[in-house]
């Protein structure tokens, strides 16, 4: 069971140069992701003179976030694992794949990366960074469930393509698959919650714009979804014994 593998870690681990380097990698990767993702939204609003939301805007957000996450995960993969997301880090912790203290270093770095990216966007664009919020008519309950489900799909994909020791050559496409699932989920949930799936992505714009309406949804949903995905995949597909089905010649 993964619960046996969950570890707090030691202060020495949290301050070890390798951990600090990994934290810096998470900071840079999250900075890249938020700057490109949120920046694309600001650019679209400028081109449309802050017009009403349109399907084209949703598609552009989906593509921008998918591409940016593909790059962000790729550049951090060999150093920190390329989490770029507190929900991914929490899912890895629940599955016993990262210690609590190392995970805290990651999450702090991710949050700082998002804040710096958001603040820099305000400076270079002279525009506000849109904070995540629920669309009109969307209740807190459905929004929470939507964020849980979308993040479950994201972290499950991370486990299947990047964490599973049996992944084999599929690990090569992990950053692409992770970017694709985020892009697809934005097409699903973007019109309702903004499709965060990532507390860091929501946190930076909230700090810079100082807008906290229903902000807890963007923490609770992703952390619950990520934790469930990590637990399910670790218990059912990594720690359980599995024998390949016999092949039959016809």
UniProtKB/Swiss-Prot annotation:
Q: Where is this motif: NPA 2?
A: 198-200
GO MF terms listed in the record are: channel activity
Keywords for this protein: Membrane, Repeat, Transmembrane, Transmembrane helix, Transport
Q: How does it sit in the membrane?
A: Multi-pass membrane protein
Q: Where is this motif: NPA 1?
A: 85-87
Q: Which domain of life is it from?
A: Eukaryota
- Domain remark in the UniProt entry: Aquaporins contain two tandem repeats each containing three membrane-spanning domains and a pore-forming loop with the signature motif Asn-Pro-Ala (NPA).
The name this protein goes by in its record: Probable aquaporin TIP-type
Instruction: Name the species this protein comes from.
Output: Medicago truncatula (Barrel medic)
Query: By which gene is this protein encoded?
Result: AQP1
């Amino acid at each position: 069971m993964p619960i046996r593998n969950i570890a707090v870690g030691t202060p020495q681990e949290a301050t070890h140069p390798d951990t600090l380097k990994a934290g810096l990698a998470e900071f840079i990767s999250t900075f890249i992701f938020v700057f490109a993702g949120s920046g694309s939204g600001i650019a679209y609003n400028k081109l449309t003179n802050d017009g009403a939301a349109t399907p084209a805007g949703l598609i552009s957000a989906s593509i921008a976030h998918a591409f940016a996450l593909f790059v962000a995960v790729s550049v951090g993969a060999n150093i920190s694992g390329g989490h770029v997301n507190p929900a991914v880090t929490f899912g890895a912790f629940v599955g016993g794949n990262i210690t609590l203290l190392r995970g805290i270093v990651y999450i702090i770095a991710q949050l700082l990366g998002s804040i710096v990216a958001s603040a820099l966007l305000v400076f270079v664009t002279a525009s506000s960074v849109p904070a995540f919020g629920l669309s009109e008519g969307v209740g807190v309950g459905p929004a929470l469930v939507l964020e849980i489900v979308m993040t479950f799909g994201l972290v499950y994909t991370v486990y299947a393509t990047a964490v599973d020791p049996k992944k084999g050559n599929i690990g090569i496409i992990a950053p692409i698959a992770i970017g694709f699932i985020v892009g697809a989920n934005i097409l699903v949930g973007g019109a309702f919650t903004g499709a965060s799936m990532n507390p860091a992505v929501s946190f930076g714009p909230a700090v810079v714009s100082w807008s906290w309406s229903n902000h807890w949804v963007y923490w609770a949903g992703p952390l619950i979804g990520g934790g469930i995905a990590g637990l399910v995949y670790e218990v059912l597909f990594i720690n359980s014994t599995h024998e390949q089905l016999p092949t039959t010649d016809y």
